[in-house]
């Protein structure tokens, strides 16, 4: 805080709140899929489960990239300094690898044909 009591970097504070919201979103996605996995629910089809799990993977890989980008914007150039305490290059690289290692486009391509053939009877 400065002498007037205002935050030193209000934009960084906004980015921090944005990143925190995305982390909560990711946790909610994981919790929902964990509940689906643990549920002994005969009403949920195998196809619905597959769509949900694959959507989790695609969503999580996009969210982790966005969260690391926000962290870099907060840290600034210090995020690239290898000897600094805010070094983020490895985290950024690892975040991008999630989208590439098991290709999200391939997953979405498979999902599109499955989802297009599903009846719209489930909750939105």
At which residue positions do the language-model features occur?
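Extended amphipathic alpha-helical segments enriched in small hydrophobics
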Residues: 1-40
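Amphipathic alpha-helical coiled-coil segments
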Residues: 63-71, 98-105
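Glycine-rich phosphate/cofactor-binding loops in nucleotide/flavin-utilizing enzymes
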Residues: 78-124
